[in-house]
């Protein structure tokens, strides 16, 4: 599929993301914890929503979680810590500093909040960053949607032969809701 993109910045960004994707090692899906993934993804998404983090942070956290679990045999009781560390790293990468959750807020999401000391959590984040060679920009579906959203719909588009100009914002909101729905499903797969 080829897109006709005229904006050179957008084209450069798209090419950069495609290049980053091509450099990723293959995801093997061999994690011993794979049977827990669905629960971990649900918990991570709910935690991200509770902290008002954007979808891009949720998706990046889940990609980090998947890829980290794919290479490590993690004790069941540590999986939620890994989720929180992935969420923290994704937020630090993806959000303004004011939106990055504080460690004290993160550990409140755990069943046993006192079980995670700040030094242990920072060490876990460091271990994860080391695993990713300190490069956690992994393009996700949400990054592509954010990048291409303005290319998808334009006020001069027609709907059943009628201009959407007067209803552009309503159509755009519906489109975003529809895309968000599919992004929520995609993260589960």
Where are these regions (language model features)?
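Acidic, Ser/Thr/Pro-rich regulatory low-complexity segments at or just upstream of the first helical elements
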Residues: 1-84, 88-167, 171-181, 185-187
């Amino acid at each position: 599929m080829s897109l006709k993109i005229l904006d050179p910045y957008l084209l450069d960004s798209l090419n950069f993301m495609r290049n980053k994707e091509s450099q990723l090692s293959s995801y093997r899906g061999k994690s011993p914890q794979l049977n827990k993934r669905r629960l971990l993804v649900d918990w991570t998404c709910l935690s991200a929503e509770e902290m008002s983090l954007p979808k891009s942070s949720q998706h990046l956290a889940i990609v980090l979680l998947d890829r980290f679990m794919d290479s490590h045999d993690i004790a069941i009781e540590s999986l939620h810590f890994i989720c929180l560390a992935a969420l923290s790293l994704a937020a630090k990468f993806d959000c303004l500093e004011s939106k990055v959750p504080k460690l004290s807020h993160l550990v409140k999401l755990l069943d046993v909040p006192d079980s995670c000391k700040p030094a242990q959590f920072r060490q876990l984040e460091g271990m994860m960053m080391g695993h990713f060679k300190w490069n956690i920009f992994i393009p996700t579906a949400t990054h592509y949607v954010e990048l291409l959203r303005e290319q998808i719909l334009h006020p001069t588009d027609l709907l059943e032969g009628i201009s959407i100009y007067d209803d552009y914002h309503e159509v755009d909101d519906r489109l975003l809701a529809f895309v968000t729905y599919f992004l929520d499903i995609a993260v589960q797969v």
